[in-house]
C-alpha cells in the first residue's frame, strides 16, 4: 500500500505523554502519513505541545478538539476521522509510544478486507514517571534493555517487542473481537465509512472499540494480527472511571446478537462545529 496514512491520536489533558508520542512519531522511517490529534477537551497545555511540534514535524499535524463533557472517546475519534485525508487510519492512544518502524510495518500489513489489531507493552507507574521526567526515548530500547526492565518490574511483558514473520498465522483469529483496542488499531477509511465509524452512544470508558470491530465483522471485514510486528509502549495511567461500563456492555451485547453494520449514531452524524482548542498563551 502506498496511500497516505492518517494516524489518529486520542488525548485528554496529558501534555507530557503527548509530547513523547509526537517525538516517537517524528522518528518514523516511513514518513508518508499525517497526524490528527483527537482531543477530548484538554486545556491549553495540550495545545501548547501541539503548537511546539507543528514546525518540527516532517509530516502534517492537525488538532481536532471538542468541549470537555466527560469521556467521549467514540465521538472525538469520529471527529478525527472526519478531519483525516488518508485512505488508511491507524488509531493510537495519546500515551502509546510507537517504535521507528511502526508506520512502515502497519503499511506492510495493510490488506483490503482486513483490519490490523496490534498490541502493547505496559510500563509501570515508576518507569513511566522516569520516562516522562527524564525524556527517555523508551521507544528506541532494544530487547536487552526491555528484558532488564522486565526483571525490575518496569514492564509487564516482552513479546510485543519481538518481530516474527507469522505469515498466514496472522489470520487465524479473523473473527475474534476480544483484545482489539484503539490504542493500536488500523482500519481502511472505506471500511470506517461503511460502518459509519464509532457509535457515539458509547460514553465513559469501555467497549466502543469492540463495537466497531464487531460491526466490521458484520460488514465482511476480518481481523489480521499485528502482534510480533506493531507493538507499542503504553505509559502508565490511573484506571479510568468505569461507571458507564455496564450500559456499554449492554450495547455491545445487542450488537453481538445482531447483524447490524452501521453505528446507531456514527460518523455521518458529526456536524462541523466551531469548537477550537484553548488559546496558547504566549
Feature-to-residue mapping (PLM):
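N-proximal low-complexity "stem/linker" segments adjacent to membrane-targeting elements
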Residues: 1-27
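A short, conserved alpha-helix in the catalytic core of glycosyltransferases
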Residues: 179-196, 202-222, 227-228
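Cell-envelope/extracellular polymer assembly enzymes that use nucleotide-activated donors
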Residues: 3-6, 34, 211
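Acidic donor-binding segment of Leloir-type glycosyltransferases
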Residues: 22-67
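Glycine-rich, basic loop-to-helix element that forms the pyrophosphate-binding segment
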Residues: 67-84, 101
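Short, flexible, basic/aromatic active-site loop/helix in glycosyltransferases
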Residues: 136-177
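Conserved donor NDP-sugar-binding/catalytic core segment of glycosyltransferases
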Residues: 101-150
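Short aromatic/hydrophobic "clamp" motif used to bind/position activated sugar donors
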Residues: 89
